[in-house]
Amino acid sequence: MIPVVALVGRPNVGKSTLFNRLTRTRDALVADFPGLTRDRKYCRAEWEGHEFIVIDTGGIDGTEEGVETRMAGQSLVAIEEADIVLFMVDGRAGLMAADKGIARHLRSREKTTVIVANKTDGIDADSAVGDFYSLGMGEIVPIAASHGRGINSLLEQVLLPLVSDGLAEAEDEFAPWPDDEAEVLAREEEEEPFDPQSLPIKLAIVGRPNVGKSTLTNRILGEERVVVYDMPGTTRDSIYIPMVRDEREYVLIDTAGVRKRGKVTETVEKFSVIKTLQAIEDANVVLLVIDAREGISDQDLSLLGFILNSGRSLVIAVNKWDGLSSETRDEVKEALDHRLGFIDFARVHFISALHGSGVGNLFESVNEAYQCATKRVSTALLTRIMRMAVDEHQPPLVRGRRVKPKYAHAGGYNPPIVVIHGTQVKDLPDTYKRYLMNYFRRSLGIMGTPIRIQFNEGANPFAGRRNTLTPTQLRKRKRLMSHIKKNK
């Protein structure tokens, strides 16, 4: 599960500066939902190949007595969502009453916390952080966020414990890309057959507040299904609900909390950005619910962007379709085509969760998307498709030389990854890369999931090697050099 890091502290201690430094941007909201997330910013960040989510909470400007009340708002939610809290203080201003109040609250929540003393550039850091040890929260990490000093050591201390388990698993599973097609084929023969269809499909239902996620979830659970049991999820408040439909096992990831089975009336749903993002990360297929009466919003596009970046399969459900006039429906479809043209691989369903129309068809697209995302494809087939694509449309010249793709093999699944080996393949223009991606998609019949193309250039075995000249070649070279010197 992707780690979550929350930044908390008084105003003007540098939380936003550190947020921008970690995310390498100055305006990178994953989502900004009115009301519930107005005072919190979320962004996906990466360090040394490790991904994590950063939450910037707005300053807590209450007094020592009032800070407990202040923390009950947006910052409290961020702290509960986080795996680790970076408690930021001002190294120049020293220890303040509000810092003590925040520290008391953090201790009461028993959250893993690291005190980060900012603005320590140009001063004696050891002396500046001395007062903060009285908070009794362990070691203090001095940084200068505006200049980027101390950021790497901070991330080492914060992230490495969170990703250590993931690193061990990755090392066990990692195998370098072979440079030889025969080696790939031999490795495929050695692999034990694995059937992803034997596993339950993890389906996350996500969307903005009040689009009908609650109603759709209850409709799914109340329609011709066998609910095995309700199992609280390991990711904070999300609920994992194993269920069976048409003899196929699913795990429904419910981000809207526990609701009574019989209650299908629409209510205002408590919405957590982190719960939604983590549900997307943990799912095989994401069902994005859109309100037909409100159309596509910027928040919907933000969620779509996160889903695509995560490489998850996608099915779109346009809810509240009942009651719309034919003219309004045509306008909605036109708007969808205009704003969602970049994800033409996803199936779009028009449903009414309240009345159940169109809900049953969703699972056909969910199963299709999962099958396409986990389909095993041989190296021979991928190489044949690649050569057909090259024959139909030759790669352009790069620095006067023709790019030569040699062979292709599968580099991963969910999403499908095709690795193309060859000379200068990394220099292909984006237009040709998109052509290859679309060609593979059409040839393999992939729907409902993004597909990624990666390029690998084998090392030149003759690089740096100099041929030994024969005696005849040495005499010829000597005469040539003598001739050149005479003509100068």
Swiss-Prot record:
Q: Which InterPro entries match?
A: G_ENGA (IPR031166), GTP-bd (IPR006073), GTPase_Der (IPR016484), KH_dom-like (IPR032859), KH_dom-like_a/b (IPR015946), P-loop_NTPase (IPR027417), Small_GTP-bd (IPR005225)
The keyword GTP-binding is annotated on this UniProt entry = yes
Please tell me where GTP 2 binds in this chain. 207-214, 254-258, 319-322
Against CDD domains, the record matches this protein to: EngA1, EngA2
What region holds the KH-like domain? 375-459
GO biological process, any? ribosome biogenesis
**Domain of life per record:** Bacteria
Enumerate the spans annotated as EngA-type G domain.
3-166, 201-374
In this chain, GTP 1 is annotated as bound at 9-16, 56-60, 118-121
Description of how the protein assembles with itself and partners: Associates with the 50S ribosomal subunit.
Described by its record, this protein's role is as follows: GTPase that plays an essential role in the late steps of ribosome biogenesis.
In the record, the note on similarity to other proteins reads: Belongs to the TRAFAC class TrmE-Era-EngA-EngB-Septin-like GTPase superfamily. EngA (Der) GTPase family.
Q: What is this protein called?
A: GTPase Der
What is the source species?
A: Sodalis glossinidius (strain morsitans)
